[in-house]
Every structure is written in structure tokens, then in C-alpha cells.
Amino acid sequence: MFGFEWFQRQMTIGKGSNVSKLALSRVQEGKQVWNRLWKLSIPPKVLNFVWRASLDILPTRANLACRRVPIDLKCVVCGSSDKTVLHILWQCPLARNVWALVKGKLQKSDSSARTFFNLVQTLKERLSRKEFELWTMVAWSIWNARNRFYFEESQTPSHAILKSAEMFLDEY
């Protein structure tokens, strides 16, 4: 009686159940985020980067370790054991230093998001289109600066990371 069939019946979700409403609301939230992202006037490679970051499919140390790549899990910049996309692009001291230089709402944005996708959702609501475009460019520039630090052993100052993001957005 309490086997697989019982479990399946318990997990079956009716059209009007709270669980299905919650699942549907999450899908709708995702659609709103993606729709806003696809409408931004940013280079396709940056759009692809933010999309991949939001889905947590960037080649972070944590994701590489999940694929059984032997790698030290500590952050290459700060040595923290937190190596998530959210840490890399928002919480790491390098990222925080860059975000502190951005003027306006971005500088004062809350960092209590639990995932990068949650952060994107939050910022999508708070920022204007222009600010959101700048945010994507800065995130992409932080990622590139970290890669330069790791692969080329070249450290880019925070103000240069921000400047390159602003210039790239202006040129686009």
C-alpha cells in the first residue's frame, strides 16, 4: 500500500493545488526575467554570459568539481571556500570593489540573494533598463578580469574593470 504507486499518487499535483500554483509562479518569474534579458541592448556574448550565469552553468570551480575535474575549490581571488557564480560576480571582494564604484542604485543594491538567478530577479525589478544593461556589462567584465587574473596572472584594478564595462556598453 505504501509503495511506489502510493508515493506517485501523493505527488500527483492537481490543477488548482498550492504546489502547482507555486511551480507556475516560478515559471512565470523565470519568463519575466528572460524576456527582460532578451530585450536588452547588449552584445550577444554578454547576454549569453548572463543567461549561463543565471542557470549556473558557467565553468566555475564548483561546477568543474561536479564534473570530476580535479581542482582546488577555493576562490582564486580571495581564498574563500565559496566558489559559486553569486560569489564570483557579486560577493567576492574584487566584485564588491567594482560594484562600489558604480553610481546610483547598483552601488547600494542588497546582496542578500541566495543564488545568482535570485539576484537577477531582484535587480530586474529595481533597476531601469539602462542600469540593468550596465549591470550585465559589469558582471561580464568582472568575469573576464577574474579569468585574466587566473590564466594570465594579470590583476586588473577595480576602476579599470568598471571603465571597460562602460566603454564596451557605450560602443555597442
What kind of feature is each model-predicted range?
Residues 1-172:
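A helix-boundary/hinge signal
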